[in-house]
């Protein structure tokens, strides 16, 4: 009977050591500034900001569990991975609407281009993030373009 207990004890020790060496646990070292995993995930988001990105894709890219990914994002950004992606998309939409060199046909087109399929929710999130509607941003952009054209024309005369 004591040999059975010893065998069980050693089996548990070996199993524990094997689990500690799995690649899924490697990424659990502390999340520090300049974390290459975090930087790789953020770079992927930036390069694919117009696409639909899943939590599972990001976790696989970071070589960690979705829960560990959440923890890493909370530490670095103060928000969840999906909120971070949505906020980056909103910032890109705002940049498009504010850019005087961008030829914008409609806000709907820009929103859809960045993956916002429900326009009501898009407008609500945009307003809660920036304090104005997308149409307000576009109107300000158009007014700035008109003002800059008028000032450049008046400088010619």
UniProtKB/Swiss-Prot annotation:
Pfam families named among the record's database cross-references: HTH_18 (PF12833)
GO CC terms, sorted: cytoplasm
Disulfide-linked positions: none
PROSITE patterns (alphabetical): HTH_ARAC_FAMILY_1 (PS00041), HTH_ARAC_FAMILY_2 (PS01124)
GO biological process, one term: positive regulation of metabolic process
Domain HTH araC/xylS-type: 39-140
Stretches that traverse the bilayer: none
GO MF annotation list: DNA-binding transcription factor activity; sequence-specific DNA binding
DNA-binding positions: 56-77, 107-130
This protein's record includes keyword DNA-binding: yes
Compartments, as annotated in UniProt: Cytoplasm
Keywords: Activator, Aromatic hydrocarbons catabolism, Cytoplasm, DNA-binding, Plasmid, Transcription, Transcription regulation
Functional description taken from the UniProt entry: Regulatory protein of the TOL plasmid xyl operons. XylS activates the xylXYZLTEGFJQKIH operon required for the degradation of toluene, m-xylene and p-xylene.
Protein name: XylDLEGF operon transcriptional activator 2
Species the sequence originates in: Pseudomonas putida
Lineage, uppermost ranks: Bacteria, Pseudomonadati, Pseudomonadota, Gammaproteobacteria, Pseudomonadales
């Amino acid at each position: 009977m004591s040999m059975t207990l010893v065998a069980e004890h050693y089996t548990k020790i070996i199993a524990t050591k094997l689990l500690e060496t799995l690649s899924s646990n490697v990424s659990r070292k502390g999340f520090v500034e300049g974390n290459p995993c975090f930087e790789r995930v953020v770079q992927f988001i930036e390069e694919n900001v117009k696409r639909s990105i899943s939590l599972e894709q990001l976790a696989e890219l970071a070589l960690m569990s979705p829960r560990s990914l959440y923890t890493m994002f909370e530490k670095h950004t103060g928000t969840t991975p999906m909120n971070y992606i949505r906020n980056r998309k909103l910032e890109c939409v705002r940049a498009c609407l504010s850019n005087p060199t961008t030829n914008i046909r409609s806000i709907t087109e820009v929103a859809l281009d960045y993956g916002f399929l429900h326009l009501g929710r898009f407008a609500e999130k945009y307003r809660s993030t920036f304090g104005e509607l997308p149409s307000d941003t576009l109107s300000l952009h158009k007014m700035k373009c008109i003002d800059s054209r008028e000032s450049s024309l008046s400088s010619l005369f």
